[in-house]
Each structure stands twice: as C-alpha cells, then as structure tokens.
A protein has these predicted regions:
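Conserved donor-binding/catalytic core segment of Leloir-type glycosyltransferases
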Residues: 190-206, 212-215, 225-228
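Short hydrophobic beta-strand element within catalytic cores of glycosyltransferases
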Residues: 300-303, 320
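Short alpha-helical donor nucleotide-sugar binding micro-motif in glycosyltransferases
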Residues: 261, 269-274
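Glycosyltransferase donor-sugar binding loop
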Residues: 224-243
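Carbohydrate-associated surface elements
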Residues: 146, 168
Length: 386
C-alpha cells in the first residue's frame, strides 16, 4: 500500500526496473491517480489496485495528527479496510506485502489476514517501534543503517530481518554536464559568481536559516546563494517561516535568489549551474537524496553530519560539519575554503559522481529482489507476487 509522494517516486523506479527484468509480479495498492493509471497502461508485470477514499475519511486525519504528536491512539483508517477487502478479492494469498508510508500501524488487520511473516514495513524516516508494530511486521526495510539501528533500539525484531534498502536516483538524468548559461543569467548570476545551491522544503529542520547566517558572515560579493524550494511540496504558498527567510535575506541584497518550487525533472539543470550544493539539515536526515542527486551531476557537497547522511556520502569526499552551536560559522568557513580551492572541488566532483552510481534504480531493484528472496524464502521456492 502506498500513499505518499516519496513512495510514488521510489515505486516508479521499482516498476520500471521490474518491467525490464520481470523477476516479480507486483500489485500496487494506492488511492486513484488518473495520471498514474494512464502511465500503467501496457505494463506486463505490474497491476495497479486503486482504492478510493471512503466517505468520512477527512475526519480521520486530525486524529492521526494527535496520534503522531501526542500519542493519542487514532482509530482504524477506513481506507485500509477497503484495501484489505480489495486484496482478499484480487489476490487471496499474496507472497509478500510491503507497507509504504502512511501510518504503519494501520496494517494490523491486513497482517492478521495474511500473516505477520508476509508483511514488511518500509521505513522512510526515524520510526519508534511499539508492541503493535512488532506484532504486525515480520521485517523492515530501512533507508539507511542509521534508520535500521534506531528502530531496533525499541523493537524485538530479529536483526536478520531488518534489511537496508538504500534509496535511489535516476542516474541517467542526474549526470555531469555544462551549466545552462541562459538559466544562470536569468537568475541574476554572472559567469564569475560562485553559486551555493540549497534545495529542499523551506522549514526550520532543513537549516536554511543557518545557511543564510553563514552567508551573512561571508563578505565576498561574488559568493551567492540560490534557494530552490517552497514550504510545501509542489506548492508556492507563503508561510511564516518563509517570510522570515525573505526578511533575513534582505541584508544580502542580490546575493540571494529564491526560485520557489522546482519540479524534480528540472533539477539537473539547477544542480549543474551551481558551484557547490549545501545540505545544512539540523535534524537526523534519513538518507539525503538531494546530496546524491547533486553528486550525480558532478557538484561538490557540503552537509551537516546527520542521520544517514555520512553513510550516503561515504567515499565522495564531501565536507561534513557538526550540528553544534556554531553551524553557521562552520558553514561559512567551509564555503570560503571550497571557494578558494577549485582543485579540491574538482576532486570532490570526481569522487561524488562515482559515489552516486551506487544509488542507481537498477541497484535499488536488485537489492529489493534479493530481500524478497531472503525474507520470503520459507514461503515459496521462488518469489512471484509482492
């Protein structure tokens, strides 16, 4: 079952690679999506199971907010009830069920119907386990060692069933190339400018305000900042935090540019026009795909030492700074240092491109299939339906 935008991104990679290799029969349960339905026409190894939201479901989501923030138990989501019935009719005995996103405890009835040993939870971020989670899932897929180890601190799950499935990018799109001079000029950057790029949601956890503080400590007018993103995915609405960022940036004048939301399909061009990509996350980052995409495009990366970030950047020669009381000071020092050492940036670029190749969609698919065989080996001689 899949309900999140990030889930869809990974699901597309999985479906595309499975159409090429044909090692699995996939049944994807999701809310109705006309665009996805059109794209699914002609698939040989994947079937889409669209389950509409039942009436009254809007009253459920405020309860989910209370559960996540204050521990107040939410009732059973009626959407999952419909998924359970649809699965029973469509595929009476699935070999394996992978829960993607949403509230993972909502799969309890599905687990009881098909068996805990057929159920895997795909953890996209830090997740605290509970007795209920342990009762529902016989295994997990974690985006990084950090996410896996953090989950196991509160779980009784056997470590051998806690799998690592690193995220992936489209390595055919995120590749090195020349900067788009017209795009760079349209954003107000001169050829001699040193452009630092931030890409992500504009919220405090992402640390963009600390990067702006770092820019305030840098007085070279040629060092500039490009901020790509918005407070909400795919939207351009204002937020109180964005207004604060814009006020903070006023002191820097034309050294800061805001683009608003940019679709992922256009991001390679933005990465390539930058001289340095900064990921100043202040919380535990599950994976850090922005950094991987930037490396794929040959851009050196400066990031905070958070969550799974060091794991994903291992071998890339990326510069990592600690999340202490002087994040802005560390960032400004690192930016100036990299600005003054183009030879070091070139080495980081070469190493980063090589590192990014580890996160291809083909590798993601092969790892997924390997996990399916390992986790479900006791249920079948060879995997078929997931």
């Amino acid at each position: 079952a899949s309900r999140g935008l990030g889930d869809v991104y990974k699901r597309q990679h999985l479906i595309r690679e499975n159409e090429r290799a044909g090692k699995l029969d996939l049944l994807c349960a999701s809310i109705p999506d006309p665009e996805a339905a059109a794209q699914a026409q002609g698939l040989q190894h994947t079937k889409m199971l669209y389950v509409a939201k039942p009436r009254g479901v809007r009253r459920y989501y405020p309860m989910v907010f209370l559960e996540r923030c204050f521990g107040v138990a939410a009732p059973y989501d009626p959407w999952y009830q419909k998924v359970q019935l649809s699965l029973a009719l469509e595929l009476p005995t699935p070999d394996l069920i992978v829960a993607e996103g949403g509230t993972l405890t909502q799969c309890s009835a599905i687990s009881k119907m098909f068996g805990k040993r057929r159920c895997l939870a795909h953890l996209h971020g830090q997740t605290s386990c509970s007795h209920e989670m342990d009762a529902i899932y016989g295994g997990i897929l974690a985006l990084s060692e950090f996410i896996r180890d953090d989950y196991l601190k509160t779980s009784e799950l056997d470590r051998k069933h806690a799998y690592i499935l690193h995220n992936c990018i489209d390595t055919a799109r995120f590749v090195p190339g020349p900067a788009d001079a017209a795009l760079r000029a349209s954003l107000g950057f001169a050829p001699e400018d040193f452009v630092v790029l931030f890409c992500g949601r504009l919220e405090p956890d992402k640390g963009i305000h600390k990067l702006l503080e770092a820019m305030e400590n840098i007085h070279d007018p040629r060092i500039k900042l490009l901020i790509v993103g918005s407070p909400f995915f795919g939207r351009t609405q204002q937020s109180p935090f964005l207004r604060k960022l814009e006020q903070q940036a006023e002191t820097l004048g034309d050294r800061v540019r805001f683009t608003g939301y940019v679709p992922n399909d256009s991001m390679p061009e933005y990465y390539r026009l930058a001289d340095l990509v900064c990921v100043p996350t202040l919380v535990e980052e599950a994976a850090g795909l922005v950094a991987v995409e930037a490396m794929g495009c040959g851009r050196p990366v400066l990031a905070t030492r958070s969550g799974g970030m060091p794991e994903y950047l291992d071998g890339s020669q990326a510069v990592l700074v600690d999340r202490d009381g002087n994040v802005a000071g560390q960032l400004s020092f690192a930016i100036r240092m990299l600005y003054e050492h183009p030879d070091l940036r070139a080495q980081m670029s070469t190493a980063g491109v090589k590192t990014a190749q580890r996160y291809s969609s083909a590798r993601f698919y092969d790892d997924f299939v390997r996990i399916v065989y390992d986790f479900g080996g006791h249920l079948w001689n060879s995997p078929s339906s997931v």
